[in-house]
């Protein structure tokens, strides 16, 4: 029989969150993990944290999970493999159009776009005469036009 450690038994279970606030520990999550309403990860103190949240919400950098015991755990956006393309004006708008047309999550900055690395998408961006660079960076894409909790998918007007 092997000894069971405290960290293997104790898990913080979080059913609530708030937008900001002080926290005693943090958990670093990539965009995919922050997009899940349920999940589990190791916090900065090496103990597990599990979250069970309302569907349809992406956790943002700096938000705070609240455990059943009242402990507060800050969400940190983890660096991940992203592509970034720099352009101005209509060239940037054209790249944004093509990325959006493929329903990709896109982060928008001042004269740049960032998306999760994908060689096929990088080739498409190259075909527009632009040159994506590869980075390891936190990814904070825009929420979609239909992402509010009251919409479960696309809403079409008659």
Regions found by a protein language model. Name each.
Residues 76-114:
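Mid-chain, well-packed structural core segment of small domains
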Residues 2-58:
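Intrinsically disordered, low-complexity, positively charged segments
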Residues 49, 72-73, 113:
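Short, isolated positions in well-ordered beta-strands
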Residues 55-57, 66, 70-74:
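Short, charged beta-turn/beta-strand-edge "cap" motif at the junction between a beta-strand
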Residues 70, 78-80, 120, 137:
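Short, ordered loop/turn segments at secondary-structure junctions
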Residues 1-22, 116, 120-158:
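Helix-rich terminal scaffold detector
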Residues 70, 103, 129-133:
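A common structural junction motif
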